[in-house]
């Protein structure tokens, strides 16, 4: 799969609303977190095959000119499925809570709410063991269900 074939997947839901963003969805990340290091990218110009071991940013966003913007960004590692299918998948490397204060839950459907809650469960599970009690209180609150 090449990046230009993946890019429309990230833009799908915005496009359904007549919206888009003017940047690529993702770019290569190299040694010492060197950003915009190719050849891999997920964008309309991404013609490089995505291969196992490549690290790519995943950063869809939306910007309403002179009003606001949002971008949720993680780094992802391309990995091979362990099922002899020769398929690849992305494993999220950078895990941080999405700020729930910035989410308009009334605009989300049940699947979107479930995705955010599942993501936050993963964040908590992966980070909590490295935190002391004060930080753990913050992480627990930040990763709790968005509909409380």
Predicted regions and their residues:
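Gly/Pro-rich turn-and-neighbor structural signature
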Residues: 1-26, 48
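Charged, cofactor-coupling segments
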Residues: 24, 32-148
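Active-site His/Glu-centered metal-binding helix of metallohydrolases
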Residues: 29
């Amino acid at each position: 799969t090449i990046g230009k074939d993946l890019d429309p997947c990230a833009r799908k839901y915005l496009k359904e609303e007549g919206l888009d963003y003017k940047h690529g969805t993702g770019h290569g990340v190299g040694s010492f977190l060197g950003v915009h290091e190719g050849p891999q990218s997920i964008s309309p110009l991404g013609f490089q095959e995505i291969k196992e071991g490549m690290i790519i940013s995943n950063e869809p966003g939306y910007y309403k000119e002179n009003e606001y913007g949002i971008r949720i960004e993680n780094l992802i590692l391309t990995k091979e499925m362990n099922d002899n299918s020769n398929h690849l998948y992305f494993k999220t490397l950078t895990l941080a809570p999405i700020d729930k204060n910035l989410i308009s839950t009334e605009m989300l459907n049940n699947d979107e709410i479930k995705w955010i809650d599942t993501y936050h469960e993963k964040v908590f599970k992966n980070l909590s063991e490295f935190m002391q009690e004060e930080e753990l209180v913050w992480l627990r609150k930040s990763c709790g269900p968005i509909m409380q």
